[in-house]
Amino acid sequence: IFLMLIFSILCIGGGKINSLNAEETETIIIGEGGDVSTSHAPIYNDYTPYALTQTLYHSDEIGVDAGLISSISFNSKMAGGLTRNIAIYLKNTDKDHYTGTKDWVVLTSEDEPVFEGVIVTPTNTGWYTIQFTTPFEYTGGNLAVTINDKTGTYDSSKHDEWGAYSTGGDDAAKRTLYVTGWSSAIDYLNLSASAGKYDYVNQGTYMA
């Protein structure tokens, strides 16, 4: 299942991000027709204190040559109103699917979070937007979206689910990984643990 997603992207004329001409803000919606919901991504919500998810979005789904991504939105299907401490990382990648449960897109200390802080997930259904503190320079290829939940507690009385769509049932369709923890936050610089792997992708919106 692929999560529905919205990007907000500042598209730069001629695909040159350092150009000052022909700038245009565009909203990109991915998976708008998805009819599935999941609690496993983008923010894992199956009653664990720590979790990390990573999802691959293809260049043809994003549909722009290059740009600065300034926000991301996910489609809330079950509104829990959970308080979570998260960090979001975006990374340009050639990877188009996961071949195994440890086949992460590797993050390094040079990969700065585009957002880091405390959020409260929606109390109503609908699109939920996270505005980036640092816009991300998207270069036109595939994109890995990693969300590290560092909260350390969970509320068993509340539950979130997010809109998604299926990318198919075969191995080449596996485009989301998730891993959970109980005693400490997931080390995003050392993603060596075996992860859950599945063929759902979140619906989403990017502003560019």
Residue ranges and their predicted role:
Residues 2-13:
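Bacterial N-terminal signal peptides
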Residues 9, 20, 38-40, 60, ...:
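Compositionally biased regions
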Residues 12-51, 187-208:
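Boundary/junction segments of secreted and surface-exposed precursor proteins
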Residues 27-29, 53-57, 71-73, 87-89, ...:
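Ordered hydrophobic segments in well-structured contexts
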Residues 31-33, 142-208:
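Proprotein-processing/basic-patch segments
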Residues 78-170, 181:
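Aromatic- and Gly/Pro-enriched, solvent-exposed loop/edge beta-strand patches characteristic
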